[in-house]
């Protein structure tokens, strides 16, 4: 079964045929592609046409969804988009608190992981006293809501802290302190006196702390908590995060592969940063569950591999979970394709530590626009040997030429591509580096110049998609006459056996795609 990341193409020296470079290894891909360099046209769109298994892809402009969603749906995928600020009802909804495993030993850990991403959206650390205290408060508040409140969501948490029905703050903490989170006592919780209790111990402990600390400190903690929850006070964000049409575990465990397009629009992407960081971190955490040993091999608990295709990766700020995950998520069926503009952008976030670069087995470089990236690429590409000749002419005794002529030949090393050559790299070209192999000098793919890709990109995207966790079918949207005519035109072309085969197999048999691990150095 072929499920490939398409990263470029190269000319076969033997017969001058174009071969597509694909990567189906369990390792990760890092791309250096400056703005307006054609990364969508040459990397993202082709990969979405060729990757057969589950995928979650960042899609700020929603162009990936519009160009590839219908093709992936026709190929048997469950397709949807999560657009936190969507107002037209087309977005799937995702409530992060639904990821908390209630009535299990994991509930506290799940709540802490969620709230850590909320209180530290800039990845500055938890050293600040009020930040760490608000983390403690929000963790308890999340647990209280999933066990006892009707609106068990992050918007519900935000509303709780600002609820005008509480005459005093003390009433807020008393409600948490006396709530019955486990009415049947099935969890075996005990209070500080070792007596059975129906109130979650973490919730009770935090409520007591909030009641006992000085008023000024309590006010600062509460203000910090309200501030970090401010995003979820937006009615649009609240509407799209109050319930769940999918859980992140569904991406790898459904009967059918899932294609999920994450759409933090250009207008809202900065303020959506806490939600974006939370979303990606939960995908990793909830899909790296313990594996089982079967017949002498460790087997992951998933039905489909997952490609995490994240464009403008450094814009998420420093995400230590992704930095660390590069070393282990491949064993859980997760493959990452991280795209950044250049090395400078990556180093501004992660410093000189090159763990991101080192953690990606394949690196793809388009022509850089800054010298730091060009210098690093010069080092990565290595050296070659060039032959040089020097001629010297000896003079006769009276100083006239005409004596002996000698030729000296020597070999010297030089960079295979210098900084200047990198900076002048053609807009049509790219270079792929594969660990422990020579680099490949290739050509960029242009999806619209590949007939099948061009036809697929014209398929009209789904206006709405059936939720993974709700059997109710979405209402169809009105279709214009022009759009209906285009759909009929494309539908006719899809009726041919060849085209239907292409759609059904997602390129599995149509193209002879060269595996990228079969490499050749510069010719």
Sequence positions of predicted segments:
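Short, flexible active-site loop motifs that bind/organize anionic cofactors or intermediates
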Residues: 1-2, 312, 364
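Glycine-centered flexibility sites
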Residues: 5-8, 33-38, 382
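Conserved ATP-driven motor cores of ASCE-family P-loop NTPases powering translocation/secretion/packaging/pilus
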Residues: 326-328, 332-431
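Single conserved hydrophobic/aromatic residue that forms the stacking wall/gate
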Residues: 1-8, 13
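P-loop NTPase motor domains
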Residues: 13-15, 22-334, 347-352, 420-441, ...
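C-terminal alpha-helical "lid" subdomain
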Residues: 446-448
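Structured loop/turn residues at beta-strand edges in well-structured enzyme cores
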Residues: 7, 24, 358
